């Protein structure tokens, strides 16, 4: 319950901060607020883009949540998504003549492998040298981004004249026009199935149980004989592979190409998403629609209402600042104070005679028993 309260307060305050920024930075606040809150649902194209972004947010949040469940924090999401998208664009820009499904599967496997290897380096350094995975993953991501930028601009630039993107993906590999059950975009459907598989892995498999135990209590994991070092490595590999899946779906689903800097901010958005959900897989999918709505609404406000500030950044900042606050602490202090006042009143008014003393002891024992029971429940 405390986690739910903290998450709800962080989200509400983040939305309030974004609304305040829109009012302060816009020349016409009413038009900007209307564009922010209503325009994402105004047309079918906006709704379709919202569903596509929700699928990407599910994959991103799964990557961040898998790292959190194993006791790690993967800050290299931007670089891992970027590398996977770049590899996908290179492998799918032309048809090889071996079957579309086979080529699509090879590109997917390569994208997952590249991102998983980048994350695996941080896991190995954590397991063998006890280095911080946050620092190593962030540094590797920071090193990969300018390297891929240079490759896109020089070697793999679109020969048709686009200076900031690779050649577009072959039309047969694009998921943008593909739909699945009830008209839901294919990206969101595939991402939901992946979320279901990851949730079953952590909840109903022996290896997933070991991952969760070693992530929460590594000393206990070592005591019972679990390979904690393997948890670090494979947890980061799984996190990187899911970030790579995000890059793959970004190229074949939403963008159709790999352009310079398309993954900027995705890693931190995924971390904010996972922190709000407290790494609960079942919460990630519905929460993805909220984050997709926020990003779509911010773009609509910037384009339609001439807003010069990307307010999604303020949402992420508010979440990072507020998610760690213990908002239930004041309520617990009030409960403790009320309990002390109750004990004082019982002591004052039940002091005369053996009958009153017995009644006082009984009242205090019943109150303490109820408090202990409610505390454990």
Curated annotation (Swiss-Prot):
Subcellular location: Cell inner membrane
Ranges annotated as spanning the membrane: 4-24, 49-69, 72-92, 98-118, 135-155, 182-202, 223-245, 249-268, 274-294, 303-323
GO molecular function terms noted in the UniProt entry: transmembrane transporter activity
Membrane topology reported for the UniProt record: Multi-pass membrane protein
This protein's GO CC annotations: plasma membrane
Keyword Cell inner membrane: yes
Keyword line: Cell inner membrane, Cell membrane, Membrane, Transmembrane, Transmembrane helix, Transport
CDD domains: TM_PBP1_transp_TpRbsC_like (cd06580)
InterPro entries assigned to the protein according to its UniProt record, in alphabetical order: ABC_transp_permease
Pfam families linked: BPD_transp_2
Coiled-coil boundaries: none
Family to which the UniProt record says this protein belongs: Belongs to the binding-protein-dependent transport system permease family.
Subunit structure, interactors included: The complex is probably composed of two ATP-binding proteins (RfuB), two transmembrane proteins (RfuC and RfuD) and a solute-binding protein (RfuA).
Function: Probably part of the ABC transporter complex RfuABCD involved in riboflavin import. Probably responsible for the translocation of the substrate across the membrane.
Protein name stated in the entry: Probable riboflavin import permease protein RfuC
Organism listed in the record: Treponema pallidum (strain Nichols)
